[in-house]
Amino acid sequence: MDLQLLYFTSIFSIFIFMFMTHKIVTKKSNSTPSLPPGPWKLPIIGNMHNLVGSPLPHHRLRDLSAKYGSLMHLKLGEVSTIVVSSPEYAKEVMKTHDHIFASRPYVLAAEIMDYDFKGVAFTPYGDYWRQLRKIFALELLSSKRVQSFQPIREEVLTSFIKRMATIEGSQVNVTKEVISTVFTITARTALGSKSRHHQKLISVVTEAAKISGGFDLGDLYPSVKFLQHMSGLKPKLEKLHQQADQIMQNIINEHREAKSSATGDQGEEEVLLDVLLKKEFGLSDESIKAVIWDIFGGGSDTSSATITWAMAEMIKNPRTMEKVQTEVRRVFDKEGRPNGSGTENLKYLKSVVSETLRLHPPAPLLLPRECGQACEINGYHIPAKSRVIVNAWAIGRDPRLWTEAERFYPERFIERSIEYKSNSFEFIPFGAGRRMCPGLTFGLSNVEYVLAMLMYHFDWKLPKGTKNEDLGMTEIFGITVARKDDLYLIPKTVHN
């Protein structure tokens, strides 16, 4: 009898224990906010199958968000990923909770090429980032500093225009010419006078950009280190890094020697390398090289892609090109010659650049952010260490936000006052908040001035047999999203 009583007592105790445990777990589960909605996850790969077969991830993510919501959860390999596709949620990430989402996730290419995250773009949020950001804002790329580079821009653009004039009436690869010109401007403003090293560095930057775009398996499975080698990306990046490091170190050494010797160019304008070498900043050579790499990578591809997209859109919309040419020629003729300060009066040209960036942001998914600590957004749980992707391209083409969203219509930026640095999160081609692109002023100055010179000096048309409306606008995805096909046009000189 005692054994039977003990048996039933034990069974009853186990039942009570299991019942209470279930209630506690259920209560805890109900009190914890759920993750944002998203497609069904498969074991091991998560949602990677949802992106397979799409060469343009920003398009595929827009389509998935239309089904699951503008705050969407994906599991890409091992990485918990939050996709933001509306200005309301973009504001939550880049303003309301900006301090939580101010860091960057692990990216293999940034670790290798950026000297273990020593550049401003991918360095973790903290004191070192604050130091770099302050140097960028107050010294490196301030409005005053960017204006001081105007003589360099004018010199480079004058050579470019003369070269175009000599081949008037012939077919020109505008894409190639613009890339070369913008890289040259960047090299001269960052490193100083023409150097035998400039073209070598440009070649390495271009090659690194080609192989670093898109999602890499090593980034999606950070705990499985051998995948970095299996994909072949790591050894390729390490080889390019060695080349870039040697080139940039030679440039730094030669710059130091030139400045310390009597043969140095005493009359030259201070360039970005001069600023970085100032002793009061206390930057190591590795930090300086990482920043130079960021300036080349972030300031050249993006600007040249934007210029080429703008030219293509104006060719498809001749009325827009005519309005830009009329404005540019009126303003510059009044001032006697083309100059950088005159671009401030080119309101319509600026609206063309804004409309180009709305439809074709060079980094459509911006740079990824990382959630520093678990938080809630609109009742949804965002786990710590989640990678956050903001689809600026989808926001810029959302028909709920923009009338005739797919139409190229620069006048919308004259009719509505929307600025790059405003609190309007429906237009964020440069990001927003703490991690907003620090090179915004530098990049826009280059884009606006190059376009102004192209519109002032030349009329442009497509090669014979190609109609404006048939011009292809297909994208190719990479670190920067550019036109898939090079743009070929025929210039006709208007102003020598």
Curated annotation (Swiss-Prot):
Induction: By fungal elicitor. InterPro entries: Cyt_P450 (IPR001128), Cyt_P450_CS (IPR017972), Cyt_P450_E_grp-I (IPR002401), Cyt_P450_sf (IPR036396). Heme binds at residue 437. Keywords: Heme, Iron, Metal-binding, Monooxygenase, Oxidoreductase. Its EC number is 1.14.-.-. Signal peptide: none annotated. Gene3D superfamilies: Cytochrome P450. The keyword Zinc does not apply. Pfam families: p450 (PF00067). It comes from the Eukaryota. PANTHER family: CYTOCHROME P450 71D11-LIKE, CYTOCHROME P450 FAMILY 71 PROTEIN. Belongs to the cytochrome P450 family. This is Cytochrome P450 71D9. The lineage of its organism: Eukaryota, Viridiplantae, Streptophyta, Embryophyta, Tracheophyta.
